[in-house]
């Protein structure tokens, strides 16, 4: 954990950011995201010299870095039903990349569920980008990585509505992560 624009990293920051990774990997075998050995924490949005834009978070697999805006991270967990959660979003990117990077944690996500996810993702991105009414916000249509990250935000924050709107995708993510938020939260379907 590396401070950027914050005085120091608190235990609360370490625990909560780590918990966001555990939330996604809880149903999987032990995953430590070993490729990502640096987590940079900014207090708020930060400027990227690479994109020439302000960002709230990002995952850079080449550099092994996860970057978090602390304010946006906290805001994401303050409202658990708006499907905007920076912690879930950035950790979704991290597990997506970690699964593809050849290391001791390579290919921990089930191949059958991943193949199904790829097909559903392609279908749904077309719907989003042709302005068809969609359960997900438009940003999910940017690419397969953003689709996955946005899908996991909805999976954990609006599971009942998600299952109703996109049952095949919900069931695929349930298999992929080996967990079901509806059962976990004991929600009515």
Show where each model-derived region lies:
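Propeptide-to-catalytic entry region of secreted or membrane-anchored zinc metalloproteases
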Residues: 1-19, 32-33, 37-40
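Short alpha-helix carrying the canonical HExxH Zn2+-binding catalytic motif
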Residues: 79-96
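Metalloprotease/metallohydrolase-associated module, dominated by Zn2+-dependent proteases
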Residues: 2-3, 14, 18-26, 46-81, ...
């Amino acid at each position: 954990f590396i401070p950027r624009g914050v005085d120091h990293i608190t235990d609360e920051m370490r625990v909560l950011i780590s918990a966001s990774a555990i939330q996604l990997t809880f149903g999987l075998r032990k995953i430590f995201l070993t490729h990502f050995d640096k987590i940079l924490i900014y207090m708020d949005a930060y400027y990227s010299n690479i994109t020439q834009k302000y960002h709230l978070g990002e995952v850079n697999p080449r550099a092994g870095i996860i970057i978090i805006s602390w304010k946006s991270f906290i805001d994401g967990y303050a409202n658990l039903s708006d499907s905007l959660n920076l912690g879930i979003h950035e950790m979704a990117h991290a597990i997506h990349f970690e699964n593809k990077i050849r290391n001791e944690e390579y290919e921990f996500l089930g191949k059958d569920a991943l193949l199904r996810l790829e097909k559903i993702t392609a279908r749904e991105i077309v719907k989003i980008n042709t302005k068809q009414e969609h359960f997900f916000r438009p940003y999910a249509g940017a690419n397969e990585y953003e689709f996955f990250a946005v899908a996991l935000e909805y999976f954990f924050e609006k599971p009942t509505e998600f299952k109703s709107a996109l049952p095949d995708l919900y069931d695929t993510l349930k298999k992929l992560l080996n967990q079901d938020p509806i059962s976990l939260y004991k929600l009515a379907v």
